Amino acid sequence: VAGVLQNGTTYSKSRDNSTPIVFAGIPYDFKYQFSEQFVKAGDNSINSGRLQMRNFEISYDRTGFFEVEVSPKPYDNRLRKIFTRTFTGRRIGSLFLGKQELDTGVFRVPVYVNSKDVKITVLSDSWLPLSLQSADYEAFQVLRNQRI
């Protein structure tokens, strides 16, 4: 493919490439907010104590672009900074001029907030494909009291 066309209606290919890969799409707004994270013991959840989140990992497959927002309480950028981390699908050693790469892997985002006081949101306004597979978290669970 000759390159990425933003508002074009045609594309051209080089003579030596008989089967080019072409990405065509309409930009759309994607937003997914994860629910509150908690620890489960069997069929019950453990709601007592404090679950201090450290990292959040999102598994993706053949994805081109997305952003992850970590919004601690209060959820307003004027009162507390909203942390944003961007995934572009580009890795060192895999970049070629005029070629859009899709990547598969795990995207890690630092959180460092109590699980009850944070919103974790995945956003995308790109025409590139986005395929989220799963999400995991790393956290400390501190129980305040326990029956003996």
Each predicted region: which residue ranges?
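Beta-sheet repeat architectures centered on beta-propellers
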Residues: 1-148
